């Protein structure tokens, strides 16, 4: 048996690889996407006070840390049965939209654009950020500028640009001042214009894939899942909606009920869990997808006017639901524009500087369980905590976006290999890159996703030491 591997998969957050196995006759036997790191945050959180969760979970990732911060904060609010003030909710939503801008601008400008600009190039020295900069430096500058706006908002509202700290039980630890708002309004003055310009550049790049017969890389039909708020796309709050491969609504439920609809499993070749819809099995049946394209597939409309115009154009061109992985890029840019519009809307609302940002919390009012849900840049994110009557965590389940897309990435690389790589001899660099293109379209965050140990019984021991002495073993 012959094996080929792509290791590491580049331009993704975290560490992964793809292996291709060929039988003794040289024919393709199987293809798998492996994630080769383990984090274990679900175990780390056991024994911690529940109010500490929003501080610990952002450390899962340095890119989508705001999403983890807010999902945990929402869950903690539910553990204490508290409803946060309107302004606190607005501030949380603001930094979530800002983080979305940061992440989407980073992914398109730095990670995805080489695939879209040089999809058939064998030369890896050209198929990278420097190659893109040589062709369109203005696009790179725009991506950096948008990312700066997003990160600055997170820093001002969240206390830190990386790993924010202000979302606490009952609301926010501090309000936004008038001076800070004025500064952010000035900083974001051209944000919507820049996002729309980037969308038009990216839209053309994605559409050019049709000419190279690459639009259907990794294509398969599946269910799609995402949050909707009265039918509109919403990355901060709402119900979870699931549509089938034909676009029919199968389920719409409160995030707290997720365990009634989603099942989790493991496979021996990856540290990522594999998720599927309960009572649905098989390729394109049990498998479902999340992330930007899925959010467009499940919603009825966008929440902002300019993004709505592009959403309508997208649906008219590609139909609904659209299943092509390459369209995640296009959808990501529509969402980048929507988040930019919402940032301006929040900052222009005088309620954003109200000082009533924290509700009174009764420390004895512990319900023992809480679920928090947001749409992270990469898809639906659920934090589920259970506690004892003292508020100490005794069980944690993190349903992370990339985990939910894991079956899709596995199927996607298999589809590419079946079409382009019949034998090892034809595995040219740009052909192998086509498999990476499918993975990167989902913008996976592998650090976020790895929190399970494989299928066979294994023991991972973590030794916590202080002053050279062992104080705890996990």
From Swiss-Prot:
Ni(2+) binds at residues 61, 64, 445, 448. Belongs to the [NiFe]/[NiFeSe] hydrogenase large subunit family. Signal peptide: none annotated. InterPro entries: Ni-dep_hyd_lsu, Ni-dep_hyd_lsu_Ni_BS, NiFe-Hase_large. The gene is vhcA. Keywords: Metal-binding, Nickel, Oxidoreductase. This is F420-non-reducing hydrogenase vhc subunit A. Its EC number is 1.12.99.-. The keyword Metal-binding applies. It comes from Methanococcus voltae. Induction: By selenium deprivation. The keyword tRNA processing does not apply. The F420-non-reducing hydrogenase vhc is composed of three subunits; VhcA, VhcD and VhcG. It is an enzyme of class 1 (oxidoreductase). GO terms for molecular function: ferredoxin hydrogenase activity; nickel cation binding. It comes from the Archaea.
């Amino acid at each position: 048996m012959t094996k080929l591997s792509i290791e590491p998969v580049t331009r993704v957050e975290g560490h992964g690889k793809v292996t291709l196995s060929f039988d003794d006759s040289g024919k393709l036997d199987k293809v798998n996407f492996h994630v080769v790191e383990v984090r274990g945050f679900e175990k780390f959180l056991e024994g911690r006070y529940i109010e500490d969760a929003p501080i610990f979970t952002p450390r899962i990732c340095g890119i989508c840390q705001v999403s983890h911060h807010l999902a945990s904060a929402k869950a903690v609010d539910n553990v204490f049965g508290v409803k946060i003030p309107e302004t606190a909710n607005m501030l949380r939503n603001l930094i979530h939209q800002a983080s979305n801008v940061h992440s989407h601008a980073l992914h398109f400008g730095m990670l995805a654009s080489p695939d879209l600009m040089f999809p058939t190039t064998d030369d890896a020295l050209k198929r990278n950020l420097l190659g893109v900069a040589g062709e369109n430096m203005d696009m790179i500058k725009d991506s950096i500028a948008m990312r700066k706006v997003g990160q600055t908002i997170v820093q001002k509202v969240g206390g830190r640009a990386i790993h924010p700290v202000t979302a606490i039980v009952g609301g926010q630890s501090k309000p936004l001042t008038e001076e800070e708002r004025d500064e952010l309004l000035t900083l974001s003055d051209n944000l919507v214009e820049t996002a729309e310009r980037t969308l038009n550049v990216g839209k053309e790049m994605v559409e050019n894939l049709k000419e190279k017969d690459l639009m259907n890389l990794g294509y398969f039909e599946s269910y799609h899942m995402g949050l909707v708020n009265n039918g509109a796309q919403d990355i901060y709050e709402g119900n979870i909606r699931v549509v089938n491969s034909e676009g029919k609504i199968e389920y719409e439920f409160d995030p707290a009920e997720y365990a009634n609809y989603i099942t989790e499993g493991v496979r021996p070749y990856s540290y990522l869990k594999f998720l599927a819809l309960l009572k649905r099995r098989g390729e394109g049946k049990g498998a479902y997808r999340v992330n930007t394209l899925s959010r467009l597939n499940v919603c009825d409309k966008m929440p902002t006017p300019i993004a709505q115009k592009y959403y309508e154009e997208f649906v008219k061109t590609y139909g609904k639901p659209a299943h092509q992985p390459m369209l995640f890029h296009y959808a990501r840019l529509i969402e980048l524009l929507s988040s930019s519009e919402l940032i301006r809307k929040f900052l222009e609302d005088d309620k954003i500087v109200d000082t009533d940002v924290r509700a009174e919390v009764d420390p004895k009012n512990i319900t023992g369980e809480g679920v928090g849900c947001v749409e992270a840049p990469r898809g639906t994110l659920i934090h589920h905590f259970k506690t004892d009557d003292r508020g100490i965590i005794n069980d944690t389940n993190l349903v992370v976006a990339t985990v939910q897309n894991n079956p899709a990435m596995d199927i996607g690389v298999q589809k590419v290999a079946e079409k382009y790589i019949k034998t090892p001899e034809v595995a040219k660099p740009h052909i192998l890159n086509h498999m990476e293109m499918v993975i990167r379209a989902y913008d996976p965050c592998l650090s976020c996703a790895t929190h399970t140990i494989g299928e066979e019984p294994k023991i991972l021991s973590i030794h916590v030491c202080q002053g050279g002495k062992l104080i705890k073993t996990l």
